[in-house]
Each structure stands twice: as structure tokens, then as C-alpha cells.
């Protein structure tokens, strides 16, 4: 994802990420738990969102860090350092390139309802851009470590967790329903429909039930493979 205005990318400047980019990230993180209702819509989605699989489980962000939820990819920050890395024989200074930087929201998978997900991300990002405290929120949720490393357990314990099932995702969507319905962007019936569908899976303790049961997991994956 990137922020553009007047056909110009506003994610970075010559120093690094802009304040508006950090605010945008803070907004997404603020609604990340309920955004899974649109981005992770089947029970097997939550079998992926577990520690130590380069998949996010906690609400945080960072640079080139595969343990975080919102990731800033390497390459276009701080005067395009990646170009020098890829071309070590390059002698001349690389000109600053402002138009390439993106950020990744790493929770969604192939089950995502892409239209509702993108609408939700835009609303969340807008909230972050407009909120007065969003830079502080971004600062508090930034990590530059592997949060799943045992030596960083103290930091891990300060972070909010993503839901672990469709059922719990629906709970977060219900909690944030007023936010999504504001200004009529998401009709009430749309939110209620997502909640009803997600809770109907009745998968609240599915991960615990399937732990180390490879055949049952395979059967479930096969069942939901073509769900969309």
C-alpha cells in the first residue's frame, strides 16, 4: 500500500518514512483485529497466523521485519540503499527516489473479501491520519526485533494479539461496528452479515483441537481450499 496525493507518493522523504505514513500505519494497527474479519474469512486462515512461521500474530510494525503485522519493505528508505546493495560496484551516488515506497499489511490471505478489506483499510488509515495521537501510537507499536525470540518476551507481552479464529474475529468486528458504519460506508446489514457468517464456523477453539493432528488439518484445508 502507498499514499499518493497529486500523483506523488507521500510515504517517504530523504530522511525516511514521513509522519503521514506513520499515522496511516497507526490507523491500520488500531483496527487490525477487526480487519481480519474481511481479510481472513475462513477457519484455516487462523492456522497460518501462528508464531515462528513468518506470519504475524501481534499488532505492531517495523522495517524489513517478518515478525510484525505491518512491514516496511527494504529498498527505498534512506536514499535508496537497496540499489547500492544490489549493485556493489556502483560508484556514483544514487539519486533519491520518492515514488516506490510501500507498506505491507501481512495478515490477509487468499480468502480475503478484497473490496470490503480495502474499504476497511482506507477507513482505518484515514482515522490514523486525522487522529492527534497517531504518531505516539505508531512510536509505541514500532519494533526492530524478532518479537518471537524468547529474549524479547517482555516486549511481546505488551502487544495486542490478532484473533485466533473466525469467531473471535467476528467479536472484534462487532466491537468496532460503529466505526465501520460511520458515514454510511459499511451498511449495518453488511457488518451483521460478516459477523453471522464468521461465527457460524464455530471455530473458537479449533487451533487447540487440531494441534498436532496432521490428517485432520489436511482434511480441513482441502475442504476450504476453494471456498471463495
Range-by-range predicted roles:
Residues 139-228:
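Acidic, glycine-enriched catalytic cores built around paired aspartates
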Residues 1-135, 139:
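Active-site capping/gating regions of soluble enzymes
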Amino acid at each position: 500500500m502507498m499514499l499518493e496525493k497529486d500523483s506523488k507518493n507521500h510515504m517517504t522523504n530523504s530522511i525516511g518514512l514521513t509522519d503521514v505514513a506513520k499515522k496511516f500505519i497507526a490507523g491500520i494497527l488500531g483496527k487490525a483485529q477487526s480487519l481480519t474479519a474481511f481479510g481472513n474469512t475462513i477457519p484455516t486462515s487462523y492456522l497460518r497466523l501462528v508464531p515462528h512461521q513468518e506470519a504475524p500474530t501481534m499488532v505492531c510494525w517495523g522495517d524489513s521485519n517478518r515478525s510484525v503485522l505491518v512491514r516496511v519493505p527494504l529498498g527505498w528508505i534512506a536514499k535508496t540503499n537497496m540499489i547500492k546493495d544490489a549493485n556493489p560496484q556502483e560508484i556514483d551516488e544514487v539519486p533519491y527516489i520518492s515514488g516506490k515506497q510501500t507498506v505491507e499489511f501481512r495478515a490477509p490471505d487468499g480468502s480475503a473479501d478484497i473490496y470490503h478489506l480495502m474499504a476497511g483499510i482506507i477507513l482505518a488509515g484515514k482515522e490514523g491520519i486525522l487522529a492527534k495521537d497517531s504518531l505516539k501510537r505508531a512510536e509505541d507499536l514500532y519494533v526492530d526485533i524478532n518479537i518471537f525470540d524468547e529474549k524479547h518476551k517482555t516486549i511481546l507481552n505488551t502487544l495486542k494479539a490478532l484473533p485466533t479464529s473466525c469467531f473471535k474475529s467476528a467479536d472484534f468486528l462487532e466491537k468496532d461496528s460503529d466505526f465501520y458504519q460511520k458515514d454510511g460506508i459499511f451498511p449495518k446489514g453488511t457488518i451483521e452479515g460478516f459477523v453471522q457468517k464468521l461465527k457460524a464456523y464455530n471455530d473458537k477453539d479449533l487451533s487447540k483441537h487440531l494441534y498436532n493432528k496432521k490428517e485432520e488439518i489436511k482434511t480441513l484445508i482441502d475442504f476450504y481450499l476453494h471456498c471463495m
